[in-house]
Amino acid sequence: MWERFPYTKGINLVPICQWLPDDRYGYRDVFDSEFLRELDKNIRAIVEPQKENRMLIGYFWTDIANWERDRNGEDWISFYQSLPADSPGGRVWQQWLSDHPSAPHGDFLAVIARQLYAEANASLRNYDPNHLILGPRYHEIDMPDHVVREVLPYVDAIAIQPTSREFNTAFFDEV
């Protein structure tokens, strides 16, 4: 079938999809070298088998990720706050706090996004330089501007999952 019909392939960069069951959902330290090795391994496993397929349009990244919303009382910020100060992400978090003492903590999401998207782009392009990177599928109600701005240098497009029954023309015009 993959040789007869155009298709896209999803790559879940971090298991923070809104629809994932609790036992598969979780934040990761995107600054940790172990996470980065796993990310590269997962991207390679998905990309290499199909990189020569002419029917492949491109790759989507994490589907409907939680960026500002919490899940079971945890979100990106509380996750980084909980990391040991000497862990890779703990050091980045502490340095960011020191450099931005009066900034809203949610601004740190841009730092997470930049790291995640830069690493994912480099890995994907290493294994497949030819197909589109369609980026993450953002949820209309959880796509912070500062996160979206960080993805733009690393993708060819982004996708947005609408949340209302009626098409939100004003929202999409603004985007």
Per-range role (PLM):
Residues M1, N53-G58, T62-D63, N168-T169, ...:
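Substrate-binding cleft of secreted/luminal carbohydrate-active enzymes
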Residues M1-I11, W96-L109, P162-N168:
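Generic structural signal for short, solvent-exposed loop/turn connectors between secondary structure elements
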Residues M1-K51, V111-Y127, P153, F171-E174:
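Aromatic-lined substrate-binding rim segments of carbohydrate-active enzymes
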Residues W2-E3, W67-R71, L134-F171:
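Substrate-binding cleft/loops of secretory-pathway carbohydrate-active enzymes
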Residues Y7-I11, I57-W61, I133-P136, D156-I160, ...:
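Hydrophobic faces of well-ordered beta-strands that scaffold small-molecule active sites
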Residues G26-V30, E52-V148:
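Polysaccharide-binding and catalytic clefts of secreted carbohydrate-active enzymes
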Residues L83-W96, D156-A170, V175:
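Glycan-recognition surfaces
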